Amino acid sequence: MKFLEKLKQAGNRNKSLLCVGLDPDPKLMPVGMSALEFNREIIEATAPFVCGYKINLAFYEALGKQGWEILSETCEFIPRELITIADAKRGDIGNTSKAYARAILDELDCDGVTVSPYLGYDSLEPFIEYQDKGIFILCLTSNQGSTDFQMLKTEYLGQKRFLYEVVADKASLWNRYENIGLVVGATQQEELKKLRLIYPKLPFLIPGIGAQGGDLKATIENGTNPNGELAIICASRGILYARSGSEFAQGAAEAAEQMRDAINHYRKRF
């Protein structure tokens, strides 16, 4: 099944654009609980309210030799009708990029992955060739340092353009399999609105809601397409750690349901 088709089915099934980030932090998890058990309980509690899960690979790499096993088992535990996106931000050349793509899209069998465009098309091609997978290119990120490079102006097709605009245009040109999307932070509302108007058919993976200060209402208004779709709204800490101790899973379920419902409230205009 093509990524966009699966995304639409998952969104319709749970009436949700919400994507929960599975970022297990030992400092915030219940004392004595393994990352795998934490993830399982979070998934069981939140699955009715989401379109999918975004798995930040760094949190698993930080767990050492057991991290890959936990990552793999976490991916297997996610219901197959929901999407799984590996937040890997990979970008390299030649066989290295091919190996990254195999690891994430074959071995883990994730539905999507985030990639960095800094090394150019040949670094992304091994991912893009997985025609049924969603390839999300970092375009305009939610962190403060994003302006260091992404907001620089450069000559492009005879005009001065911001670098993030060049990335978005290249992504659109490379989208021959209709499997490419953009990562655009919820902290960049003016630019988010501009990008959505120019690229109504591209899915946007939108981090930055909650702890990073992104406004949910503005994100829905600016980030969805004319049908109120094609925006994947990411939230991690505000859901995973909504409550502490033994009630963490119930807290996550309530937080996910509340955010799902808030998103749908703002989607009513569509």
Swiss-Prot record:
Catalytic residues (UniProt): K89
Biological pathway: Pyrimidine metabolism; UMP biosynthesis via de novo pathway; UMP from orotate: step 2/2
EC number per UniProt: 4.1.1.23
CDD domains, per the entry: OMP_decarboxylase_like
The UniProt record lists the keyword Thylakoid: no
Catalysed transformations (reactions): orotidine 5'-phosphate + H(+) = UMP + CO2
Top class in the EC scheme: lyase
Biological process (GO), any one: 'de novo' UMP biosynthetic process
Any one GO molecular function term: orotidine-5'-phosphate decarboxylase activity
InterPro entries found in the cross-reference section: Aldolase_TIM (IPR013785), OMPdecase_type-2 (IPR011995), OMPdeCOase_dom (IPR001754), RibuloseP-bd_barrel (IPR011060)
Record keywords: Decarboxylase, Lyase, Pyrimidine biosynthesis
Gene3D superfamilies: Aldolase class I (3.20.20.70)
SMART domains xref list: OMPdecase
Family statement drawn from the similarity comment of this UniProt entry: Belongs to the OMP decarboxylase family. Type 2 subfamily.
Protein name in UniProt: Orotidine 5'-phosphate decarboxylase
Source species: Dehalococcoides mccartyi (strain ATCC BAA-2100 / JCM 16839 / KCTC 5957 / BAV1)
